[in-house]
């Protein structure tokens, strides 16, 4: 067998074959002939699949035949249970679902997953405690879990949701916004109760102030009635000699007592009105005082503009000279 000649192109050797004489002659004839022309053409693409492709798709849609390929590489834990043995220890528990046969029904798959995960957790707990002080308590807990798993294997505990009663009501999970709204209702109801208590306290204070005003008025009327009775007694019957020196003292105390009583009633009324008015009255008084101060300040500034300092000093010197001359005289 003859080797094809090699040509060096840089550092790469390319092996080329011999060109046929017919192809060279055909190329030269096409290039030499000026009458030949090239035309572009369109090739239509198929819009739909061919009948054979359609038939193959229909065949693939059907259920495939049962194959023994799915059963390869699986170990049976026991013949009676029908469940597979635990996966390898290196397989993490969150990937157990990948090793469960897809041919099983959903209840059996969840049962298989529950058995695998529980067995793996028991083994981890056994390695964790070992011979520690809590080993005996952990062993008791593991024995209880193992009994539950044995009952699950013996089909004494059912995890199938197909056998539940048809009228069973499944509670819906509460919406997070509803939980927040319930919490807000509790907070606002507590706030409303506090406000009601404050309102009741203020109403009690107001009722006490009104009752105190009424008691003062009734006391004042009683004093006036007593004074009127005493005046009538003075006019009708003379006083005994023992009470004669005390008359001037009582007559002197009467006007003071009336004035003190009026001042007390006025102060109580003022305090009550200020308590009811609250911060609005204080803010209004402060606003008026600030306005008066600003107006007074502006008037002083405007007056100082028109006053001449030299004339002011001259007037002060004349006043001091006149006062000194008057003192010398």
UniProtKB/Swiss-Prot annotation:
Transmembrane segments: none annotated. Residues 1-81, 228-249 are annotated as: Disordered. Residues 15-27 have a biased composition (Basic residues). Its main location: nucleus. It holds the Pfam family MIS13. It is found in: Nucleus. GO terms for cellular component: condensed chromosome, centromeric region; kinetochore; MIS12/MIND type complex; nucleus. Residues 55-73 have a biased composition (Basic and acidic residues). The keyword rRNA processing does not apply. Keywords: Cell cycle, Cell division, Meiosis, Mitosis, Nucleus. GO terms for biological process: attachment of mitotic spindle microtubules to kinetochore; cell division; spindle attachment to meiosis I kinetochore. Acts as a component of the NMS (Ndc80-MIND-Spc7) super complex which has a role in kinetochore function during late meiotic prophase and throughout the mitotic cell cycle. Required for correct segregation of chromosomes and for maintaining the inner centromere structure. Component of the NMS super complex which consists of mis12, mis13, mis14, ndc80, nnf1, nuf2, sos7, spc7, spc24 and spc25. Interacts with dis1, mal2, mis14, ppe1 and ekc1. This is Kinetochore protein mis13. It comes from Schizosaccharomyces pombe (strain 972 / ATCC 24843). The lineage of its organism: Eukaryota, Fungi, Dikarya, Ascomycota, Taphrinomycotina. The gene is mis13.
């Amino acid at each position: 067998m003859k080797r094809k000649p090699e040509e060096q192109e840089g550092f790469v050797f390319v092996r080329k074959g011999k060109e046929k004489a017919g192809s060279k002659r055909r190329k030269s004839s096409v290039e030499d002939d000026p009458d030949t022309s090239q035309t572009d053409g369109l090739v239509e693409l198929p819009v739909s699949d061919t009948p054979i492709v359609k038939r193959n798709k229909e065949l693939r849609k059907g259920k495939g035949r049962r194959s023994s390929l799915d059963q390869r590489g699986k170990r049976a834990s026991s013949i009676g249970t029908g469940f597979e043995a635990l996966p390898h220890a290196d397989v993490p528990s969150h990937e157990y679902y990948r090793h469960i046969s897809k041919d099983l029904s959903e209840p059996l798959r969840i049962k298989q997953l529950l058995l695998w995960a529980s067995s793996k957790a028991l083994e981890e707990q056994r390695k964790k405690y070992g011979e520690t002080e809590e080993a005996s308590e952990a062993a008791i807990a593991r024995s209880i879990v193992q009994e539950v798993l044995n009952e699950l294997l013996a089909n004494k505990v059912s995890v199938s949701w197909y056998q539940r009663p048809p009228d069973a009501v499944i509670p819906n999970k509460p919406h997070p916004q509803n939980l927040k709204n319930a919490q807000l209702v509790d907070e606002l109801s507590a706030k409303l109760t506090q406000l009601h208590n404050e309102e009741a306290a203020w109403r009690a204070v107001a009722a006490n102030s009104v009752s105190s005003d009424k008691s003062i008025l009734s006391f004042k009327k009683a004093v006036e009635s007593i004074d009127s009775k005493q005046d009538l007694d003075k006019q009708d019957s003379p006083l005994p000699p023992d009470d004669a020196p005390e008359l001037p003292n009582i007559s002197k105390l009467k006007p003071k007592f009336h004035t003190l009583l009026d001042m007390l009633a006025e102060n109580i009324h003022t305090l009550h009105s200020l308590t009811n008015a609250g911060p609005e009255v204080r803010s209004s008084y402060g606003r008026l005082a600030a306005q008066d101060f600003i107006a007074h300040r502006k008037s002083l500034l405007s007056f100082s503009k028109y006053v001449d300092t030299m004339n002011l000093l001259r007037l002060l010197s004349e006043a001091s000279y006149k006062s000194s001359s008057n003192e010398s005289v």
